[in-house]
Amino acid sequence: NGIEQPLFQGREWVTACRKWKEKYPVVLPRHWQEDGLHANAYAFVDYLSTQLPPRTLTVVSNGTCCVAGHQAYVIKEGTRFFNSNAVASMGYGLPAAIGGCVANKRRTTVCLEGDGSIMMNLQELQTIITNALPIKIFLINNEGYHSIRQTQNNLFADHCKVGIGPESGDLSFPDFSKLARVFGYPYFAAHSNKEMQ
């Protein structure tokens, strides 16, 4: 009759997904290996999400935050996870976190932002401070526009390094610890998986 039967019926699908999740974990032991220089984004998102209480609102911006967030974030009961997946708009995180926090009666909100993305709406830090919004920002600093960096490395190898960060010689970012202090935002840094924990 041309109608295909589904591979799984009812709860079989959930059971199959759980088995695959165990067999093919997103966060692997290599993500936790220490290099002493950088915290791994997948390990970070996994660790952070397991430490957050149930019912946490989490907003992820674009790039690494979005990719690692979608794959490694552990969803708990009542958790809300907001993203801009379809267009991955730079600068989405801060205003979306503000909107999510206010719309949910000032519920504690976590915002995962990238160093490039936060620069698009940096002024919103003052909105958060002025309104005493309970928003915790976790900045993934990969020293530039990492998604663009990956595209250039994958497609053009060493022939093209433009507008991606220090290695292109035409783009730099501010000292985020100083920026946080200027806005009156507490700042803590973790440069390795060990420091992160």
Segments from the language model and where they lie:
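Thiamine diphosphate
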Residues: 1-7, 68, 73-197
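Generic low-complexity, intrinsically disordered sequence content enriched
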Residues: 11-12, 32, 183
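Active-site diphosphate/adenylate-binding microenvironment
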Residues: 16-95, 100
